[in-house]
Amino acid sequence: MEGKISLNLAMSLDGYICDENGGYQWIHGDGTHELKSASKWSHEEYLKEIDLVVMGRRCYEQGMHLEFNDKEVWIATSKPLPASEGLHAAGKELCSQVLDEKQKGRNIYLYGGGVTIDPFIKQDLIDEYIIGIIPVILGCGKPLFLGNNFTIELRLKDCIYEEGIVILRYVRH
């Protein structure tokens, strides 16, 4: 059975995945509980289904790979990485390597950032988009979508909301 490639990340209301300094401190809810969906998002449950995490070099340099110590992690970089169990440097052929893993039945989590995931979007390789919309307008930063994309039609599979955060889960038609 074929696996899936899943993009899962937070985005400001105006489309940024980090602020202009590369920070993520703005990723939190508004603290209100008036509106909440019956279902809840569980990142832990999501991760149980994931076999491989793919992230960019900046995410790696910020230590984000450390939260996935029980997963295989691929870093999108052409530079060598320190010898470490579970880390793999993936360069120019990242998309085709990830597609090979998907065809082996592995579920892949595209963690970020924008430059790393852009080729997957442009080649329409993402099976599932899970986007958490954070109730903040940053005004500037690094955008999720880098532009020059063609139309990709998706189907809304789930919508979860709590504390002002809306998590949208889209799948391919």
What does each of the following model-derived ranges do?
Residues M1-H173:
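Enzymes that bind and transform nitrogen-containing heteroaromatic metabolites
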